[in-house]
Structure formats: structure tokens, C-alpha cells
Amino acid sequence: MAQETMSFQAEVKQLLHLMIHSLYSNKEIFLRELISNASDAADKLRFEAIENSALYENDPNLRIRVSYDKDARTITIDDNGIGMSRDEAIANLGTIARSGTKEFFGKLSGDQQKDAALIGQFGVGFYSGFIVADRITVETRRAGLPASEGVRWESAGEGDFAVEQIERAARGTTITLHLRADEDELLSSHRLKSIIQKYSDHVALPILMKKEEWDAEKSAMVTKDEDETVNQASALWTRSKSDITDEQYKQFYQHLSHDHQDPLTWTHNRVEGRSEYTQLLYVPTHAPFDMFNRDHRGGLKLYVKRVFIMDDAEQLLPAYLRFVKGVVDSADLPLNVSREILQESRDVKAIREGVTKRVLSMLEDLANSDNEADKEKYAGFWKEFGQVLKEGIGEDFANRERIAKLLRFASTHTDTPEQTVSLADYVARMKPEQTKIYYVTADTWQAATHSPHLEVFRKKGVEVLLLTDRVDEWILSFLTEFEGKPLQSVARGDLDLGALNDEEKEAQEKVSEEFKPLVEKMKEALKDKAKDVRLTFRLTDSPSCLVADDGEMSGYLQRMLKAAGQQAPSFHPILEVNPEHALVKGLHADSANFDDWCHLLFDQALLAEGGALEDPASFVKRTNALLLARANEA
């Protein structure tokens, strides 16, 4: 078949340009990425060969070979893994076939350092070769296809690439990098070995290079025909923890996740009992850009007796821990396990429970530590992954109490947007007579902290949690109490902030009686908007506020459902008015513009809690009319 020239997918062109300019300062990663791809290709061959051993083609010893040619100025990475067909080469090397691509490009800022971290999260893989090469040649043949169906793919990393069919006896893939003019320092056995040992020492396959020895007669290093293995070539998780350095754990994480940054923390142990498995689990430092994308691929790499089975085995982790990276190697599962079998397997259920408990323990160790560095780590974790962890309150009944202790919130105690207050912190600071944990929900911290509902709490020195994440209202339907203390919205039902003395009771009853006719008339004026109108003594500075009855949907949750395009019942709140406020005191049931004042008090309260007016034009018209009337009176 003749050579065919094709254009890169638009996103590939953009990624290549960004990557070459943003990642050059860390150019060594090209070799890590290409070796990682070669390792994946070997894993895939092992997996497919479980059903069809003929794919080994009498060459079962899998390996990766790295070589260089000073005269040609090339570096070559060769593997005898699964290889690619023509269609696979075009798809894998010419397009980015993954979710979240649009979100990724939308988050790029132009700041080289920040963009480099983001590109690392996205995963550059094969394209990293263009950081050091101005041309890349790939020759490959998929295992099981005839030698006549080899493929050559070549590109200068600009707008297009060429593909042609070739004769190739060996299965697998050979990638040749034609180096840029200023990259000659890479053409050294010592340099390449040092990069391999730095980034890929843990790769389970042997990485081979030709031995070099000093030739005294030539006064130079001479390449021998003999191979040497330049990495440890054993799966990191199978080694004893005492034999693994922190640096090796970090490098394995980067190999596993394609993240250029170090992990926040990790745990490594072997579990024995009903199910036997080894787990090496990492919590990243930063959330991936597509964490909240419905198609986000989460989960762990699953191995059975060191044989790779699948990426993203989401059955091993609950969705609220989808940020965790790592490896689980089972001794009990069958080698031909499928995703369908995983869903029904008792062994998998036991592994999932064990992995979940291990991750929660890892987070608890950070959250409960007296060490300042660990405290900072947990604060960083919460900032990145707190919203995701909160989902566990509704999804994981068995671990709900453990997750509740890990939650962090903003609070009137700290009066900052930082979410640093735990429920245990709140309970420890409760007033002697206080029986409930109070909270307010709002779209933003500013809206929460300025809520009229907080006025009486500030006056009495009672702490209120400020909940501003979209998931908060949902999780509170599952988290109704903590350590025997009910959670109570300050915008629901009647509040009991302590017993009143006889004098206070009598005074409030007297005021209620005085305002009874006015309140009845307000109910009539607002019958289409408000479920009820009543006096309140919870306000100190605001004339009015909206509350919902216990068990009814709040205005915040209704707005959230609407924003998500879901059906939400109509919102008919209770309007509470402050009899001590001048606006309420000045209301007269027989005044000509009484109805307008009632609607204004309702609309103001709605705006104060972050709600949207159904008819903004009428609100403006009504407000102007009332201002004009007051101006004329003056």
C-alpha cells in the first residue's frame, strides 16, 4: 500500500505546540513516557495471550530495548509487546481519544509553569518525543497479523503525518527519535541509563541496553554485542517496603499516573485472609482537570498474580474515592476476569472494602496528626478533593461516620472562606445549653456570611457552619446528626436558642398580638408568593428573611436542581418579618402602597439568600414607586 499523508486532529497540533514550549525544562520525561507506553504494550499482550497464546509468536520473553546512534543522531525505543495495526496507529498516534479534552484546553492559562503541570495531568504519552525530536519514525506490527501488515508512521510534529504498509517480521513497536540540533547530550549510554534508572527503575519488564566498556587502545567507550538490564525489572509493589525508598515510590507514582508532580501521600501493604492481595495506593497532590466530568476515568490498575488485567478497575473503588491512583495485585481472582465478573465477585467486594478502609485510614492519619506538615497536607487535600469526598456521605453508609469526621467546613468561628473546621471542632465549642449543630447553605461564602439568618447567632455567640459547595445540601439529607447532635439549618423551622425568661416571653407575646392584624394583611398580599407570614425575633439588622418548614425543599436546593436542568417543585417559603426594624414598624395596613411594601420585603429577603427574582422589571418599578412616594413625603 502506498504512503498516505494525513492531518493531525486539531487538538493534537495544539498539544504538540504547548508541550514543546511548556515541558522543555523537564525534557527527560520523554523517555519515561515512551518506556511507560512500551510497558503498557507488554501488559496488553500478556492479557490477550491468556486467551490466545499464539500471540507470543514463539517469543514469550518480553522486554524493552533502548539504543542510540551518534552518527545518525537518533534514539530508539523498541518493544516486543502487542504492537499496532494500521488503524490503531492512526487512531493512537494521530488523535487524542479521551474524554475531558475540551475542559483541558479551556483551563490552559498561558502561564508556562501552571500549563506544564496541567499538561502532565492530561498525559502527553507518545507526543513527549517531540520535546527532543524534530521527527519521529514508528514501525510496528500487531501480534497475530502477518509480517506483510507492518506499519510505518512518520511525522515532524507539525500539521500532518505519513502512514504506509511495510514488511515487518517482529511484532511490537520501534520508535526512532531524530533529535533536534541541540540535543546531542542525550546520545550517551551513561545519560540514557541515568534517566532510565531515575524514572523507570520500577518497570516490571527488563529494559535492555548494549553493554559499553572502556577500550584502552582506542581510549574510548566501546559498545559490545552483549545486553545488560539497566533497571531492577521487578514490580515495585511486590518488593518489601523496607527495600523501597521514598524517591522510588514517587517515581512509580509518576509512571503510573503520568503526573509530573509528587503524590501527596501513599500506602503499601499486603492483605492476607479471606482474600489475598497487595495494594499500593496514592493520593495525588492536585485534582485532575476533569474530576467532575461524568466520563472521568477513575480506578486502579488491576493485576492478578502480577499479570496485568485492566486499567481503571472502578469496581475496586467507590466513586467518591475516584481520585486515588494505584495498583491492586490479587492472588485469588481468575486470570480471565472480566469487568462483568468483577461486578459479581465476592473477592472483589472484599478487596473494595479493604481498599476503601485503607484510603480512609490514610486520610485519617493526616487529618488527626499533630504534625504541622501533615496538617498542611490534609488542608491541601481538602482543597483539591473535599467536594468529591463529601459524596461518600450519601454513597457509603458503612463508612459514613468515618467520612463525617474527615469533613471540613467554613464557619463563623474563623470568618474566612477556608474550609478548616471539622464537626468535632464545632461540637467541642458548643455552648453549654446548645443541643444542635447549626449551618447555613448559600451559593458563595460572601452570601453565607451576610445571610440575615446569622444575625441572632452572631448576637448570641453561637457558631454556624457556612456551607457553599454544591454537594452540601444533598449530603445533609444523609448526614442528619453527628455524635448525637442533630444538624439544623438556620433557615428551617422555628429556632430554639435557649429558654426565654418570663419577662422576655411576655414582651414577645405582646408584640405578636400588636402585629397580628398587620401580619394577616401581609399574608393576603403575598398569598401567591409566601406559604405563610409570621413575626420573628431571630433578626437584628434585617427587616425580613425567608425560611422553609422542616422537611420541605430549601430555596438553595431548588435553585441547584434548576441549574442542573432537573425538575424542582415550586418554592413557597415562609416570610418572617422583624418587628423591631423601622421598615416593618412603619408599615400601615391601610396605606395605599401597602402591597408594594410587602412584595419589597419578600423580594429583598429572596435576594439576600441568593435567590433570583421571577420578575426583576416589576421589582425595579415597585422600588422606584416607593422611593418616589417617600421623596414626595419628605
Curated annotation (Swiss-Prot):
InterPro entries per record: HATPase_C_sf, Heat_shock_protein_90_CS, HSP90_C, Hsp90_fam, Hsp90_N, Ribosomal_Su5_D2-typ_SF
SUPFAM superfamilies: ATPase domain of HSP90 chaperone/DNA topoisomerase II/histidine kinase, HSP90 C-terminal domain, Ribosomal protein S5 domain 2-like
Annotated Gene3D superfamilies: 3.30.230.80, 3.40.50.11260, Heat shock protein 90, C-terminal domain, Histidine kinase-like ATPase, C-terminal domain
The keyword Nucleotide-binding belongs to this UniProt entry's keyword annotation: yes
Cellular component GO terms held in the UniProt record: cytoplasm
UniProt entry tagged with the keyword ATP-binding: yes
Keyword line: ATP-binding, Chaperone, Cytoplasm, Nucleotide-binding, Stress response
PANTHER family the UniProt entry points to: HEAT SHOCK PROTEIN 90 FAMILY MEMBER (PTHR11528)
Subunit structure: Homodimer.
Family in the record: Belongs to the heat shock protein 90 family.
Role description: Molecular chaperone. Has ATPase activity.
Protein name listed in UniProt: Chaperone protein HtpG
